[in-house]
């Protein structure tokens, strides 16, 4: 493994070497048995528990640096690791270990009139480059998911989480070695220089097969603009909740507060609340009061001043903002049609929820909104691969090609065709 180097070193040469090693490791990993990959992941989970004190000490360094730089509380929350979060990380990896191995699965098969038997079979993608920012848990999730799917991975975390990610990466390597798999199958970029990102986006001389960016709008935009390899885009989570006139108020209140306030700094946190104008008198005040009581700042459109005066006014900028904080924008809309219109204008195509009891309203919401995840009578905070039973996720893909929604093990595979004959030649 490459050791940490100074930024003044030749970043391009370092990255090309990482790419070469990843490509070499991808070949044996692609044919590794399900049992060996399972053993590696179980060993990783064990290492996380055994090294928890080291990981927390490394995280303390990152947190100290972050606080000195004056970052927002939401950023600190995303960066923070605790004993509980490390246990959750380990449990998530154990869950990934127990998933069915996708590699070699026959997705479909059929016979042709000429006697050929055709199978479509899952295969690893190859080498995946993951570029992310302040969440150190992505190091564990991405490494484990790529390993389960038989892919080598190059991890480029943000400089803010460097010490935490490096400590977690050591656990991943320990698991690989324990199972007799190549240590270079999971590599971490050892330089903070942003030129490393640019090098990854070139594909490292054909070594990288796909890039997964996980971070803010500027990072994802850069990746999409500069990448010379396919990208699974994880855009911002500008998530909406629409509360219909038919909604159960008690249920709506519980869901809205959870969707916004459970963890404000995750991409599945609700950022805009849309309320059916036809039930404003019944719904608006109790929903807003519940949010305020939970410690949330409410920014409301002008028409809500008659229902609940004294709220901060919302602007068009608010409808386009992923706060990742205890702030929500609220608007009255003309029923389901108004909700659909607003969401289709402002959504990032990540996650939207509807709270309603009228089936026809729900079906319109599901059919006319084209976001990756749509929920009915459930919190947007369920937009998570672990909650979907995937064991974890490498991100929420908001594009429409190949992977969409939570990118789990299955989405990190491609396929090939196996055609079996008995001597056929084409006339």
Curated annotation (Swiss-Prot):
It catalyses: L-glutamate 5-semialdehyde + phosphate + NADP(+) = L-glutamyl 5-phosphate + NADPH + H(+). It is found in: Cytoplasm. The keyword Ribonucleoprotein does not apply. InterPro entries: Ald_DH/histidinol_DH (IPR016161), Ald_DH_C (IPR016163), Ald_DH_N (IPR016162), Aldehyde_DH_dom (IPR015590), G-glutamylP_reductase_CS (IPR020593), Glu-5-SA_DH (IPR012134), GPR_dom (IPR000965). The keyword Transmembrane does not apply. Its EC number is 1.2.1.41. Keywords: Amino-acid biosynthesis, Cytoplasm, NADP, Oxidoreductase, Proline biosynthesis. Gene3D superfamilies: Aldehyde Dehydrogenase, Chain A, domain 1 (3.40.605.10), Aldehyde Dehydrogenase, Chain A, domain 2 (3.40.309.10). One of its GO terms (molecular function) is glutamate-5-semialdehyde dehydrogenase activity. GO terms for cellular component: cytoplasm. Pathway: Amino-acid biosynthesis; L-proline biosynthesis; L-glutamate 5-semialdehyde from L-glutamate: step 2/2. One of its GO terms (biological process) is L-proline biosynthetic process. NCBIfam families: PRK00197.1, proA. Catalyzes the NADPH-dependent reduction of L-glutamate 5-phosphate into L-glutamate 5-semialdehyde and phosphate. The product spontaneously undergoes cyclization to form 1-pyrroline-5-carboxylate. Belongs to the gamma-glutamyl phosphate reductase family. This is Gamma-glutamyl phosphate reductase. It comes from Sinorhizobium medicae (strain WSM419).
């Amino acid at each position: 493994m490459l050791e940490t180097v100074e930024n003044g070193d030749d970043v391009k040469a370092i990255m090309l070497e990482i790419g070469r090693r990843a490509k070499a490791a991808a070949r044996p990993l692609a044919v590794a048995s399900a049992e060996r990959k399972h053993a590696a992941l179980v060993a990783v989970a064990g290492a996380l528990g055994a090294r928890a004190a080291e990981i927390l000490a490394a995280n303390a360094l990152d947190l100290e640096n972050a606080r000195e730089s004056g970052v927002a509380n939401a950023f600190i929350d995303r960066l923070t690791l605790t004993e509980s979060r490390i246990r959750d990380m380990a449990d998530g990896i154990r869950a990934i270990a127990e998933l069915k191995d996708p590699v070699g699965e026959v997705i479909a098969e059929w016979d042709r009139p000429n006697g050929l038997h055709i199978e479509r079979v899952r295969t690893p993608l190859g080498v995946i480059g993951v570029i992310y920012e302040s969440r150190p848990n992505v190091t564990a999730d991405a490494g484990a998911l790529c390993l389960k799917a038989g892919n080598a991975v190059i991890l480029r975390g943000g400089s803010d989480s460097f010490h935490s990610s490096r400590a977690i990466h050591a656990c991943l390597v320990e698991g690989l070695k324990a199972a007799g798999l190549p240590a270079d199958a999971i590599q971490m970029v050892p330089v903070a220089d942003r030129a490393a990102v640019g090098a990854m986006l070139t594909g490292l001389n054909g070594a990288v097969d796909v890039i997964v960016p996980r971070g803010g709008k500027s990072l994802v935009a850069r990746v999409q603009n500069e990448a010379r390899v396919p990208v699974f885009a994880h855009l911002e989570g500008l998530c909406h909740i629409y509360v219909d006139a038919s909604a159960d108020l008690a249920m709506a209140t519980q869901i809205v507060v959870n969707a916004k306030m459970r963890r404000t700094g995750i991409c599945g946190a609700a950022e805009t609340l849309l309320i059916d104008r036809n039930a404003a008198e019944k719904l608006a005040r109790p929903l807003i009061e519940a949010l305020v009581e939970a410690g949330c700042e409410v920014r409301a459109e002008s028409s809500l001043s008659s229902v609940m005066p004294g709220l901060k006014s919302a602007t068009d900028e608010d409808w386009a903002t992923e706060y990742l904080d205890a702030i929500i924008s609220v608007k009255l809309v003309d029923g389901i049609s108004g909700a659909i219109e607003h969401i289709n204008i402002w959504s990032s195509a990540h996650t939207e929820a509807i709270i309603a009891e009228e089936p026809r309203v729900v079906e319109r919401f599901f059919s006319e909104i084209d976001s990756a995840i749509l929920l009915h009578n459930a919190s947007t905070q369920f937009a998570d691969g672990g909650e979907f039973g995937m064991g974890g996720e490498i991100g929420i893909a908001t594009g429409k090609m190949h992977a969409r929604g939570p990118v789990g093990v299955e989405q990190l595979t491609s396929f090939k065709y196996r055609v079996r004959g008995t001597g056929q030649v084409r006339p």
